[in-house]
Amino acid sequence: MTIIAGTVVKGKQLGRKLGFPTANVDAKIHGLRNGVYGVLATVNHQFHLGVMNIGVKPTVGSNLEKTLEIFLFDFHRDIYGEKIECSILFKIREERRFDSLESLTKQIKKDISCVAKRFELIGIMAPNKKESLLSHQELNLPDLCFYKKCNNLYGVNRGVYNVIDNWFFEYGITQVAYRRIYILSFLSFLKEDNPKVSSKYIRFGAGGLADKLNRFISSYVEESEENILG
């Protein structure tokens, strides 16, 4: 999976002025699509949920350099100069230009609310609270019990669950609770991709499961790098 690593640097602090302080990250972001994402960030070995923007900030200028900034939920510490790792879980929209800073501010509020809701639906954020549930007991259930949770929520059978779990393990996500976040995020993506299906069971359609995983990841990877499964 895509993990972005870099150092938090001081930016122009526009987010802070708008009421949404962000961590500007000096990192290699070549190959990633501009847009707004739900992410899992790691600072000092602690997990934090957040909203990430990759892009050129077209509302505040033109011909600007592509940057990466992250808003972390319920986080108020100064981390300039510290290392941060960020794993993309899902994308909510493309980057776009707004007519005014007021319009931009309204959209940022919507983005934060949208990402928080997605985290709630996945099961890793408490409703009405910006606290992480990464240590929540459901993410640390015995494997069979966690599979049954996925089956009840998304109608995935045991064989498909095992394939998905193994994929993320092979991508280097070896920590169990961390990997289960990806599993829930992917299953949520599959369900959204089939909104008109009346059955509670997931349907894969043409291309099967491998195609769905490619689409899940290619939502944030540039076209030249989309076919990650070869």
Curated annotation (Swiss-Prot):
It catalyses: riboflavin + ATP = FMN + ADP + H(+). PANTHER family: RIBOFLAVIN KINASE, RIBOFLAVIN KINASE/FMN ADENYLYLTRANSFERASE. Keywords: ATP-binding, Flavoprotein, FMN, Nucleotide-binding, Riboflavin biosynthesis, Transferase. InterPro entries: Riboflavin_kinase (IPR023468), Riboflavin_kinase_bac/euk (IPR015865), Riboflavin_kinase_dom_sf (IPR023465). It holds the Pfam family Flavokinase. Induction: Repressed by the HTH-type transcriptional regulator CymR. It is an enzyme of class 2 (transferase). It comes from Bacillus subtilis (strain 168). It comes from the Bacteria. One of its GO terms (molecular function) is ATP binding. This is RNA-binding riboflavin kinase RibR.
